[in-house]
């Protein structure tokens, strides 16, 4: 049987682009949905039939009855957050969540000492805060790279786990007590958490890499669900105001345990304007009533943290960088309806640099981006409502012109347009699985 076509969905901006809705929509055709990086530091919001669900760790395909979902080894897993999410889904009537969810044995676990250090560090930074969610993501990735992580497979061997834990806590408690003036974390408290979660987590641990490769050989389509956004990538984002993982399409290969030849189509999710949460440079940020209007109409508050998002004009130069580093096959433009009624629209097509130079692509690193002054093209907006429009031809002429100009400046085609939060409020120009 021929190998199935597989799709990677990534955020192409600074996160919060609307990936959850699109993954949920694409999951109709998938045989499996896979998370491959990040942790429970970002929420994916899904609206089905007017009912809202926020997922943080579990793939957005879980609402589809009978669909298998996977958490690959690139994800750092908080057992308590995971079980809390499962309990929420069970209470909402979602069937057989634990039976359909598989976790790679190689996933690093987020435990109480990660959270303690994450929060103590951020408190110590004062004005230099990075904007971490304080959920232990960064310290858990540090442990992975430093080869001291306690991983999902360790839950199957509690006698060996205690030895590892004692060694890890010796390292953590020195930092907590002497660098951050915080209290130590007790091994007994961590073991109490582990003993509570292990019986439920253990049955979900499986060789995710093998299962995914078998599914692909059997002709099942796979959907890889990214978290955060490409401009928050640890290597290519506005460092150090970034997340702790690789958020790019290429990370799906390593983070899920599949070969790169299995990644057939990369769908970049792109908001019709730009937002950013927390600290870091943002060249097109708006500080006027237009920005406030976008925030209000777009409900721009983090689904996990509740933090207000900063809003700005569409940044095509930043998106160019994202298209380049991800190999984006097509774009899904979300929240087009939020732009309804904006009289004049600006698109950033490049930046003026110190010394008189210009560039048409976002530089790497926050120091370089801080110095960028946006170069704008102006377009007329539209007064008509695009809310819930399901046909491209039914869009206002100026909305279509806006989408066309985004394609021209960025160099990638628009495949999908989202005109509302519900699964059905979607215009399809090219189906990624086609």
UniProtKB/Swiss-Prot annotation:
Lineage: Bacteria, Pseudomonadati, Pseudomonadota, Betaproteobacteria, Neisseriales
Annotated protein name in UniProt: Adenylosuccinate synthetase
Family: Belongs to the adenylosuccinate synthetase family.
Positions of GTP binding: 15-21, 43-45, 309, 335-337, 418-420
Alphabetic keyword roster: Cytoplasm, GTP-binding, Ligase, Magnesium, Metal-binding, Nucleotide-binding, Purine biosynthesis
Pathway: Purine metabolism; AMP biosynthesis via de novo pathway; AMP from IMP: step 1/2
Catalytic activity of the protein: IMP + L-aspartate + GTP = N(6)-(1,2-dicarboxyethyl)-AMP + GDP + phosphate + 2 H(+)
Gene Ontology CC annotations of this record: cytoplasm
EC number: 6.3.4.4
GO BP term (any one): IMP metabolic process
Residue positions binding IMP: 16-19, 41-44, 133, 147, 228, 243, 307
Cofactor: Mg(2+)
Co-factor binding details: Binds 1 Mg(2+) ion per subunit.
Record gene name: purA
Organism: Neisseria gonorrhoeae (strain NCCP11945)
Localization: Cytoplasm
GO terms, molecular function: adenylosuccinate synthase activity; GTP binding; magnesium ion binding
SMART domains in the cross-refs: Adenylsucc_synt
Transmembrane parts of this sequence: none
Active site as annotated: 16, 44
Domain of life: Bacteria
Residues binding Mg(2+), per UniProt: 16, 43
Known role: Plays an important role in the de novo pathway of purine nucleotide biosynthesis. Catalyzes the first committed step in the biosynthesis of AMP from IMP.
């Amino acid at each position: 049987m021929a190998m199935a076509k597989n799709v990677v969905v990534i955020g192409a901006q600074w996160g919060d682009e609307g990936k959850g809705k699109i993954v949920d929509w694409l999951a109709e055709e998938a045989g499996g949905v896979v998370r491959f990086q990040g942790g429970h530091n970002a929420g994916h919001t899904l609206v089905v039939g007017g009912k809202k669900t926020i997922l943080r760790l579990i793939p957005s395909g879980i609402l589809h009855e009978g669909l298998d979902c996977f958490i690959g080894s690139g994800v750092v897993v908080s057992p308590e957050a995971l079980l809390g999410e499962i309990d929420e889904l069970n209470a909402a009537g979602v069937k057989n969540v634990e039976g359909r969810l598989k976790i790679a044995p190689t996933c690093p676990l987020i435990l109480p000492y990660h959270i303690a250090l994450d929060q103590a560090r951020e408190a110590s930074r004062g004005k230099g805060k990075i904007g971490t969610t304080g959920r232990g993501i960064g310290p858990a990735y540090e442990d992975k790279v430093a080869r001291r992580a306690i991983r999902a497979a360790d839950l199957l061997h509690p006698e060996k786990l205690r030895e590892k834990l004692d060694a890890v806590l010796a390292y953590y408690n020195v930092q907590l007590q002497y660098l951050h003036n915080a209290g130590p974390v007790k091994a007994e408290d961590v073991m109490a958490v582990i003993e509570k979660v292990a019986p439920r987590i253990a049955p979900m641990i499986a060789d995710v890499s093998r299962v995914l490769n078998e599914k692909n050989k059997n002709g099942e389509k796979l959907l890889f669900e990214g978290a955060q956004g490409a401009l928050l990538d640890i290597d290519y984002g506005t460092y150090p105001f970034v997340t702790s993982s690789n958020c790019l399409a290429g990370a799906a290969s390593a983070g899920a345990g599949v070969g790169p030849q299995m990644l057939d189509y990369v769908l970049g999710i792109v908001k019709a304007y730009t937002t950013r949460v927390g600290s870091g440079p943002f060249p097109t940020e708006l500080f006027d009533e237009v920005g406030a209007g976008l925030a209000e109409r777009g409900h721009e508050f983090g689904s996990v943290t509740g933090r207000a998002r900063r809003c700005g004009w569409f940044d095509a130069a930043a998106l160019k960088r994202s298209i380049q580093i991800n190999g984006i096959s097509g774009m899904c433009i979300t929240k087009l309806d939020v732009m309804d009624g904006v009289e004049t629209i600006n698109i950033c097509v490049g930046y003026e640099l110190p010394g008189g130079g210009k560039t048409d692509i976002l530089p790497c690193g926050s120091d370089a981006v801080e110095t960028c002054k946006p170069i704008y093209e102006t377009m007329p907006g539209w007064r008509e409502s695009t809310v819930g429009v399901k046909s491209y031809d039914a869009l206002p002429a100026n909305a279509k012109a806006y989408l066309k100009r985004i394609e021209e400046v960025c160099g990638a085609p628009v495949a999908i347009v989202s005109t509302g939060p519900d699964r059905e409020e979607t215009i399809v120009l090219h189906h990624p699985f086609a």
